[in-house]
């Protein structure tokens, strides 16, 4: 029921491989505690519902709910919606996207963090079927108007402003705002045409490591300052000494993907190994390779020399 992208053999996977059968595919971005997701899956057992949520606590609550209710037509992903859209959905296969009460990021300096921007609508068009749609429900009028303008700017959608369906007002936040007497806004963004720019899945790699000659340092002091990468940023958060060497807790951010993973520096039969630990099923991306390269640079500063480089 929980989708772990690193364990998928293919990106994006076939619907059959993800769900075990074919059917109309729906993506819910930001499912919270999963109560709307569960209601949707119960009411439309023929639908296949893929949910994306950034909160680990919410994902856990939703997983428990789906298992408790025995909902076999739901798959949940812990991470950002655009990542799921890009890497878990094949082009032209998505029937509907549902976005209920997204974070409005009301401050002007934070508006680039908003989900429903022009670039997102353009990319979404590559995944929706002809006539597929995105349904937005929000209590934030300014965000609602912003989303309408961003979609209309693409020329790829017909926008229909409608009363919100009752089911969309039974989410955790909707019930809270309803008690507070807030107004709600709802629109359907229906695909008319597709953006010509392709949106291929994120490139991933099997390995990211290097072999070095020299002695393993007695100490590996790594500053907690951001390492700027071409694809994003990495921060070495903490170093722990083990029997064979060091483990480095590393935070890596890139477009639509944030990972906390372990890098390791240890003795091997052929020298000193520096690379990604497989603990936690990390995704080896260009940014992760860049983080390993930055770690190797620190080791070179300790006098080690690279003899094999797969970063």
Swiss-Prot record:
It comes from the Bacteria. It holds the Pfam family Methyltransf_4. It is an enzyme of class 2 (transferase). Its EC number is 2.1.1.33. The keyword Chloroplast does not apply. Pathway: tRNA modification; N(7)-methylguanine-tRNA biosynthesis. The keyword Cytoplasm does not apply. GO terms for cellular component: tRNA methyltransferase complex. One of its GO terms (molecular function) is tRNA (guanine(46)-N7)-methyltransferase activity. This is tRNA (guanine-N(7)-)-methyltransferase. It comes from Thermus thermophilus (strain ATCC 27634 / DSM 579 / HB8). The gene is trmB.
């Amino acid at each position: 029921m929980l989708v772990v992208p690193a364990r998928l053999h293919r990106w994006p996977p076939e619907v059959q491989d993800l769900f075990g059968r074919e059917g109309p595919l729906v993506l819910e971005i930001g499912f919270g505690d999963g109560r709307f997701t569960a209601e949707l899956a119960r009411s439309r057992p023929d639908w296949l519902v893929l949910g994306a949520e950034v909160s680990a606590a919410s994902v856990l609550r939703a997983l428990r709910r789906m298992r408790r209710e025995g909902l076999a037509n739901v798959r949940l992903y812990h991470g950002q919606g655009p990542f799921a859209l890009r890497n878990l959905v094949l082009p032209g296969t998505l029937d509907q996207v549902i976005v209920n009460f997204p974070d409005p990021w009301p401050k002007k300096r934070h508006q680039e963090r908003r989900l429903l921007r022009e670039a997102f609508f353009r990319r979404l068009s590559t995944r929706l079927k002809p006539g597929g749609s995105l349904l937005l429900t929000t209590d934030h009028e300014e965000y609602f108007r912003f989303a309408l303008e961003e979609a209309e700017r693409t020329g790829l959608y017909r926008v229909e402003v409608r009363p919100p369906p009752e089911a969309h007002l039974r989410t955790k936040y909707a019930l809270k705002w309803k008690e507070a007497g807030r107004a709600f806004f709802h629109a359907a963004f229906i695909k008319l045409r597709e953006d010509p720019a392709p949106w291929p899945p994120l490139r991933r790699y099997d390995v990211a490591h290097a072999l070095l000659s020299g002695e393993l340092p007695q100490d590996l002091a790594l500053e907690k300052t951001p390492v700027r990468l071409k694809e994003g940023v990495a921060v070495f958060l903490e170093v722990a000494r083990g029997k064979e060497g060091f483990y480095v807790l590393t935070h890596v951010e890139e477009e639509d993907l944030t990972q906390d993973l372990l890098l390791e520096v240890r003795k091997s039969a052929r020298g000193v190994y520096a690379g990604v630990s497989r603990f936690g099923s990390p995704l080896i991306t260009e940014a992760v390779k860049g983080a390993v390269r930055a770690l190797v640079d620190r080791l070179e500063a300790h006098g080690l020399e690279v003899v094999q480089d797969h970063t």
